[in-house]
Design a protein with these regions (language model features):
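Short coil/turn segments at beta-strand junctions that form active-site/ligand-binding loops
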Residues: 60-61, 116-117, 134
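SF2 helicase motor core recognition
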Residues: 112-116, 121-130
Length: 170
């Protein structure tokens, strides 16, 4: 007879093998097929705003890690310009309510340490703090030189133990 007590000591072991455990880290790379600029935002920046809105509506707390302060300000302004019915509560890192808004926009010199569910990374290099997240969203831009940097980040996520996926936006 098998002792079923191990299920209580190690609850994740009795999950369906295909079911993700709460500890599994996932990185999804969105493939972009163009770099159309609209309203002062690149295609990837437009997509970041849409993904952040979608994840916030799903009840997640999001950190958007920008390449620099100028990019953070562009995203901040774009999120403020959304119609009232699609408003996304957000703030630049270090601003807003205590604990931050559900969506925080940061850059390398300015990042809060409040808990977030998802990292949306616009960084061209692998963000060393990405390993603190169980879900990361990254991008494979249209431009060839930026694709090579995305390949390097993909390898870094794999080495960090992330389950890797690719996707396209609807």
């Amino acid at each position: 007879m098998i002792n079923a007590g191990w299920r209580y000591a190690y609850p994740a072991l009795h999950l369906n093998p295909r079911q993700e455990t709460p500890y599994m880290k996932n990185a999804t790379f969105y493939l972009l097929d163009n770099d159309t600029h609209q309203d002062g935002l690149s295609a990837v920046e437009q997509l970041v705003c849409e993904i952040a809105a979608e994840r916030w509506r799903a009840g997640k707390r999001v950190l958007i890690a920008c390449e620099d302060e100028q990019q953070a300000i562009r995203l901040d302004e774009a999120l403020w310009a959304r119609p009232p019915e699609s408003f996304v509560p957000h703030n630049l890192s270090g601003e807003g309510p205590r604990g931050g808004a559900p969506v925080e926009i940061a850059w390398p010199q300015k990042r809060n340490s409040s808990a977030r569910d998802i990292l949306i990374s616009l960084r061209t290099d692998f963000a060393d703090f990405a390993t603190a997240f169980t879900e990361v969203i990254d991008f494979v831009p249209y431009e060839d030189s930026l694709k090579q940097l995305a390949r390097e980040r993909y390898k870094a996520y794999r080495l960090a133990g992330f389950n890797l996926n690719t996707a396209t936006w609807k």
